[in-house]
Amino acid sequence: MKVLVTGFEPFGGEKGNPALEAIKGLPAEIHGAEVRWLEVPTVFHKSAQVLEEEMNRYQPDFVLCIGQAGGRTSLTPERVTINQDDACISDNEDNQPIDRPIRPDGASAYFSSLPIKAMVQAIKKEGLPASVSNTAGTFVCSHLMYQALYLVEKKSPYVKAGFMHIPYMMEQVVNRPTTPAMSLVDIRRGIEAAIGAIIEHGDQELKLVGGETH
């Protein structure tokens, strides 16, 4: 069994990206499954091209994309991604698509095919905060999640894919003391726990409360 984990390069003026820094330190094997990490550019469409090339080479069973969500207080597996780019800032190549479909021939939205509630449960068992998120945003994170699930639908139906957002790492908030952050060690532990749940449960979701009132 093989798991491909992606993380973005720094963007938005940040010197580092906890997604990339965390996955670099992942073990090569988790719960008996082979784990490979991949750096992707924080660029619309190019990020998907890099992912597709690696999926073709590596032939993973699972794809877990990781992204930074500054301001979030917990690790948040994403439930859904919409077919819409609406960038509030430019990506790393100065692209800023506004109200643009990601794939004109794609579905209006795709749901994660990973066991997101099992992932949340596993992260919480490590003593770390986690919750299901119902919005992946409309920047490159959501773009890549959508593209991954589009590729799965069109070309690799045996693959299960999804996305998880993580908080800032502590180094990023030294001068922003009121901004939520988490140590890189804990972020990595949370990602490992999520991968463990993916391997254990596959696409068999747990029937747990994970919704919101608004």
Swiss-Prot record:
The keyword Nuclease does not apply. GO terms for cellular component: cytosol. Its main location: cytoplasm. This is Pyrrolidone-carboxylate peptidase 2. It comes from Streptococcus pneumoniae serotype 4 (strain ATCC BAA-334 / TIGR4). It holds the Pfam family Peptidase_C15. One of its GO terms (biological process) is proteolysis. The gene is pcp2. The active site is at E78, C141, H165. It is an enzyme of class 3 (hydrolase).
